[in-house]
Amino acid sequence: MTSKCTLPDLPYDYDALEPIISKQIMELHHKKHHQTYVNNLNAALASQASALDSNDITQLISIQQKLKFNGGGHINHSLFWKNLARYDSPATNLERSAPSLKDAIEKQWGSVKNFTDAFEAVLLGIQGSGWGWLVSSGKTGFLEIVTTKDQDPVTGPIPVFGVDMWEHAYYLQYLNNKASYVQNIWKVINWEEAEHRYLNGTEELGSLKL
């Protein structure tokens, strides 16, 4: 293994999402939770390299779940930080920042309100820990709301934006009131980034660049 995965810097300060997401949550979420996924992913990759060198098939098989869980945690959080923006910044205005995506949403769901209601229902329907995503099929631009369990990443379609529904993403501030977290998250969604991912996905197919 020639290089290690690293924790990405946030594109804003830890208090930039207040009052929607507190500074305390952002610091713990980024410095502790995401860093742990990175550390464990690097350890799993090192074990994989060792197993490959020794041709230890049993060891290779045994570490696949660690690679999936921690690799998914790293991918999902790296996307999540980018699809959030400073509270009240221009990027959080859907109409101005994501006209193409807004048109596609209205075409498929009838209105933005219908879409946000549907997305919130999916998020609140997640049992245990997981993620809710708006994804694009690629060149067709077809949009879909999907969920992934635990830290499973989106594979196949292009993730336009995602919402972390693990308790560590909201509990210190919202306690067991998940509905308030889900309703408020729209105020810090980075629609400018979502528009970029949507347009990039409809113009070319390929692996998503973090």
UniProtKB/Swiss-Prot annotation:
Residues noted as binding Mn(2+) in the record, renumbered to the chain: 29, 77, 164, 168
Domain of life of the native organism: Eukaryota
Assigned EC number: 1.15.1.1
Gene: sodB
Protein name, entry field: Superoxide dismutase [Mn], mitochondrial
Pfam families: Sod_Fe_C (PF02777), Sod_Fe_N (PF00081)
Function (record text): Destroys superoxide anion radicals which are normally produced within the cells and which are toxic to biological systems.
InterPro entries for the chain: Fe/Mn_Superoxide_Dismutase, Mn/Fe_SOD, Mn/Fe_SOD_BS, Mn/Fe_SOD_C, Mn/Fe_SOD_N, Mn/Fe_SOD_N_sf, SOD_C_sf
Organism: Aspergillus niger
SUPFAM superfamilies recorded: Fe,Mn superoxide dismutase (SOD), C-terminal domain, Fe,Mn superoxide dismutase (SOD), N-terminal domain
Single GO molecular function: manganese ion binding
Cofactor annotation remark: Binds 1 Mn(2+) ion per subunit.
Catalysed reaction, written as an equation: 2 superoxide + 2 H(+) = H2O2 + O2
One GO cellular component, as annotated: mitochondrial matrix
Location of this chain's protein in the cell: Mitochondrion matrix
Required co-factors: Mn(2+)
